[in-house]
Amino acid sequence: MAKEKKKSLGLWITLGIIGFVILLMVGSLVFVEVSINNLSTSLEQKQTEVIAAYEARSKTLEKLTGMFESKMKLNSDVFTRLEKAEAALEKAEDVKALSDANLVVDSAIDNLIFVMRDKYYYLETPEVWEIEDEIDSARSRIVLKTTDYNDVAKDYNFAIENFPGDFLSSIFGHEGTETFQIVDYDDITF
């Protein structure tokens, strides 16, 4: 009878340990899945912030182009290029398209500023300098927001590519995300 109690007690202890380990594993999987979902939500929020920074820059550009478009009729291709770039940015739906369109917009902005300074230097006023400062500020915000997005994207990609996240990703269909290309504006000179 004493041996049976020891066997029974040992069996219950073993089952308890196995049950505890299973609970820990399930709990950790749930924790990882919740973390992945939180990162996914954060990615969406960061992407919204990047788009808001693009829109703020667009409003500043409207001021600048409004001041110069009528005076720079000979260089209407500069404005056409900028309008097409802005339209491509508005149509972009994923991170890669947004990133590529942003590079085109930045190139068009640089071209506009270069033409202004080169051919229409006599039109520059303190008001224009203020708008150029606003554009620089908008670019800094874009760099900050895209860097924030990229940091979360790297965490998200790491979480879904490594165990146990990769296991959960295959079950729940999580896919990796791309990062934005970040322009180093310090390298740009006119």
Language-model-derived ranges and their functions:
Residues 2-190:
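A helix-centric hydrophobic-segment signal that preferentially recognizes long
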